[in-house]
Amino acid sequence: MTTINPMNFRRREILAGAGVLALSAVTLPPRAAGASTLQDRRPPKADRRFTSKAVEAEIARVKAKIRDPELGWLFENCYPNTLDTTVKMGEVDGKPDAFVITGDINALWLRDSSAQLQTYVHLTPQDTDLRRLFCGLIQRQARCILIDPYANAYMEDPNARSSLPAISDKTQMKPGVAERKWEIDSLCYTMRLAHSYWTATKDKTPFDALWAKGAALAVATLREQQRKDGPGPYQFQRVDKSPTETLMFGGFGAPTRKVGLIHSGFRPSDDACLYPFLIPSNLFAVSALRMLAQVHNEARGDAAAAQDCAALAAEVETALRAYGQMDDGQGGKVWAFEVDGYGNAIFMDDANVPSLSGLPLLGAADRRDPLWQRTAALAWSQRNPYFFSGSAAQGIGGPHVGMDMIWPMSIITRALNSDDDATIRQCLTWLKGSHGGTGFMHESFHKDNPANYTRPWFSWANGLFGDLILDLERRKPHLLR
């Protein structure tokens, strides 16, 4: 039976008590007795939520190039996991609608749903059904933003009240909102998904007036959270023993000097920020706003909306250069993790992307940039309090599930950003050893014991692992052979 890390038990117990664990939503195969059996871990075909012929062909094509049976088995299990288990298709006003849950929590996160589909975007030109899924999610996300741009997670029914304990949070909980933790990256991920789909297909279908209204509100919200003219409308407090679940000073967060950076209440991990200027998310905002500007220009011919995006991106970029860096202790500069604009900063990294380590994955940094390289090297070291090294693996975790718990996402990120064959091989070895016999990636696992893991069903990590294998097939096929 899966061992639950004690520091994460409180969260999982609360979610289970609220009736939001959705493991019964699909038929999952029983846990593997061991990797040596390599039994198919996918749901039976009749129980799969969504099937794409292009994705199935991609699985067969790439798996045939993988010599290691266990690595091929993991790819075949993980890559289609989002489609197999998390998608619910429908229609709204005659247009496709897609509700995509995270896995074992029955709600749609803007960040997770975007990242979960991202791995399939290169196949959309080949598959009408897959394009319909992307259109459905892009439209669903626009409607979610119009319900409340400050929410991070949403209910399937826009009129339903949250089934999570978030319903008792001290904030403005609206119908349709599952949780209302303000995170910059939530809105940025929707911009990136729209751009990726447009770039791959040149299909204007999802980019209608509804989408444009949602996109405009997203940009306005990012600007509002620069807080130049006061604290803004967002407040959040939660009655919880963990300080990572709430914001200080009446729910507005720690004080800041208003310098043009965007405030974030919470990190991509859903943990509260110590200092409200979360640098990885501000860097992501710059790249995402420029992606959105391109969609406005090309898909809608809306030069004014594109200019609005570009202007905010330029302002935040200027502020990042002035306030987003710190000394590395060795005479150089690195990106800080969080700052307050007064000169105070913390250095750490969290496995959830956008992380400092994961910036190139989002187009928010260049892998060849010396500033980013110094930052990533420092994050993969003892300077980062959430870098863990054990007998099972090395990797980065975060406060969300506690000490000594490595997130496979951080190992995948390291491999995706590396050009060194030995580093990538080591990451693949760690990942193969992390699944605890299940054939899937997890939220986290103990640095000394992969059988001690959190979240048996976490589709974002599964999709990112699929991304890694596809990347290696294109970039370093000899490592798979």
PLM regions and their residue ranges:
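N-terminal secretory signal peptides
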Residues: 1-10, 20-25
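Signal peptide processing junction and immediate N-terminal pro/mature segment
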Residues: 29-35
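Low-complexity, Ser/Thr/Pro/Gly-enriched N-terminal "stalk/linker" regions
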Residues: 36-111, 136, 165
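Well-ordered alpha-helical scaffold segments within catalytic/enzyme domains
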Residues: 54-67, 115-128, 189-204, 283-301, ...
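Extended, well-ordered alpha-helical scaffold segments
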Residues: 74, 129-144, 203-223, 292-295, ...
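Aromatic-rich carbohydrate-recognition surfaces in CAZymes
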Residues: 106-134, 138-243, 459-473
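Extended ligand-binding clefts on enzyme/binding-domain cores
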Residues: 110, 146-157, 166, 219-286, ...
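C-terminal capping/lid segments that line or modulate ligand- or cofactor-binding pockets
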Residues: 169-175, 180-182, 346-366, 404-481
